């Protein structure tokens, strides 16, 4: 592993119907409350259990909301974004950016000829120690003869 974290970024249109608890999620971010360094976007901070977003299942905590009913959320104060969501109506269309962390390394069984991931020293040191003990025991045995 090289210590780098890679992300796969995808966008999706999600249509939600407002329920008794609203759209069923909380937001963070905005130009006055940056949630992500160098990004003043609006992000999902919490999905409410049994809310519209949870029942739909596609919106996830950490998703960036790009637009609400076609209105861009760039460069908005947090409260302006909250007001936009509150006044969005009964049927709400969200343009969302998902950031999925990509695993840095193999995800399945390793093929033939691929390294096992065990450092060679973890194998060689015990083998070397065992060889030394065997050599010492052999030398002691020969001295007795």
From Swiss-Prot:
Residues 1-117 are cytoplasmic. PROSITE patterns: PDZ (PS50106). It holds the Pfam family PDZ. It comes from Bos taurus. CDD domains: PDZ_SYNJ2BP-like (cd06709). It is a single-pass type IV membrane protein. The chain crosses the membrane at residues 118-138. Coiled coil: none annotated. It is found in: Mitochondrion outer membrane; Cytoplasm, Perinuclear region. This is Synaptojanin-2-binding protein. PANTHER family: DISCS LARGE, DISKS LARGE 1 TUMOR SUPPRESSOR PROTEIN. Residues 13-100 form the PDZ domain. Gene3D superfamilies: 2.30.42.10. Binds (via the PDZ domain) to isoform 2A of SYNJ2 (via the unique motif in the C-terminus). Interacts (via C-terminus) with RALBP1. Interacts (via PDZ domain) with ACVR2A (via C-terminus) and ACVR2B (via C-terminus). Forms a ternary complex with ACVR2A and RALBP1. Interacts with MAPK12. Interacts with DLL1; enhances DLL1 protein stability, and promotes notch signaling in endothelial cells. Keywords: Cytoplasm, Endocytosis, Membrane, Mitochondrion, Mitochondrion outer membrane, Signal-anchor, Transmembrane, Transmembrane helix. One of its GO terms (biological process) is endocytosis. Residues 139-145 are mitochondrial intermembrane. GO terms for cellular component: mitochondrial outer membrane; perinuclear region of cytoplasm. The keyword Zinc does not apply. Disulfide bonds: none annotated. Its main location: mitochondrion. Regulates endocytosis of activin type 2 receptor kinases through the Ral/RALBP1-dependent pathway and may be involved in suppression of activin-induced signal transduction.
């Amino acid at each position: 592993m090289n210590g780098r974290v890679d992300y796969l970024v995808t966008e999706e249109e999600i249509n939600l119907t407002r329920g008794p608890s609203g759209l069923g999620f909380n937001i963070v971010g905005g130009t006055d409350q940056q949630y992500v360094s160098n990004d003043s976007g609006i992000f999902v901070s919490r999905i409410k259990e049994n809310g519209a977003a949870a029942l739909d299942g596609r919106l996830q905590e950490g998703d960036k909301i790009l637009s609400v009913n076609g209105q861009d959320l760039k460069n908005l104060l947090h409260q302006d974004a909250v007001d936009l969501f509150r006044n969005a109506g009964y049927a709400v269309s969200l343009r969302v950016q998902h950031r999925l962390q990509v695993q840095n390394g193999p995800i399945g069984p390793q093929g033939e000829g691929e390294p096992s991931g065990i450092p060679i020293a973890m194998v060689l040191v015990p083998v070397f120690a065992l060889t030394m003990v065997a050599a010492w025991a052999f030398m002691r045995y020969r001295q007795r003869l």
